[in-house]
């Protein structure tokens, strides 16, 4: 499949348009696992992978390396099946954890300089039929926090997919984050990610981009805030206080 994508898609485009960006849905560097299932796939206990509660994170081939693609394109959707994988009381974290696992897997393993353009979607993707009254939509606030963490873990841009009836609400959820992020353009274009941890249970999530001795940080607390958190970045301390709903630029000491 990788050879086919290179020979029939990437190479012809790059010959005609040298230096162009070429990529494809769901094809990206990763940590050896895939943390989501597409709409046409079924979950089987026989799949080789990593079991976590009701979630089975499948082993996934390194198909990106030989495609010749010039950007990575992870899929960060609110797939409805994710909801039942976990028993977290905080409904937002049922979406946040698997999406952050997938996004962080790509960001951590993508070489510096290779853009990451992430497919995103806020509305519940492929909702169950009949509807599950217990399933809670990812809140706009939770989704926007997720987008911030993706930017501060190295995502270069977002590619919004949605059915036509969802256009207005999807753009209203995504655009404010993208617009606000432009204030930190130098960090986004030149900074290097400092954190990729994804808590197993609802707690404190921290992401950041380092530029010299400064770090642009986003901290999101699921549950009660735990006070100041200390990270070690290249042997230096980074103290991250609670800052609900906003970014911070902190100095390494």
Regions found by a protein language model. Give the residues of each.
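Glycan-processing catalytic domains of CAZymes
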Residues: 1-253
